[in-house]
Design a protein with these regions (language model features):
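Tandem repeat scaffolds
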Residues: 1-129
Length: 129
């Protein structure tokens, strides 16, 4: 699968106000500012390391195997999101909603988690400090 470049993603962002159900598998979004609605988006294997996703809506999105190392996810909606095998090392999840999210096998070492809502979230086999 070809990795989508940041320029291609910027073009998509210009054309759409929200990115509901958008296919961004393998996208290179390293360090991008993405304050959008990604509800139901496919972001499997995407590089979102150091991305600024503050306040974004990622509910019901598929983020399996995504790289979210050092990402700013403060106050982000991640309800019902598939985060299995996601690398979240050093990510800031302050005030994030992870209700019913699937975090099995996710790497959560060094994450910032104050005031995070996790009702019904599945952390089975996830790596934590």
């Amino acid at each position: 699968m070809k990795r989508i470049s940041i320029k291609e993603v910027e073009k998509i962002l210009e054309e759409k106000r929200n990115l509901i159900k958008v296919d961004l598998r393998f996208a290179d979004l390293h360090g991008a500012y993405l304050h959008k609605n990604f509800c139901g988006a496919d972001l499997r294997f995407a590089d979102l390391s150091r991305a600024d996703l503050r306040g974004a809506i990622l509910s019901c999105a598929d983020l399996r195997f995504a790289d979210l190392r050092g990402a700013d996810l403060r106050n982000t909606g991640l309800n019902l999101t598939d985060l299995r095998f996601t690398d979240l090392r050093g990510a800031n999840l302050s005030g994030t909603e992870l209700n019913l999210a699937d975090l099995r096998f996710a790497d959560l070492r060094g994450t910032i988690l104050p005031e995070t809502k996790t009702v019904g979230a599945n952390f089975l086999f996830s790596a934590r400090d």
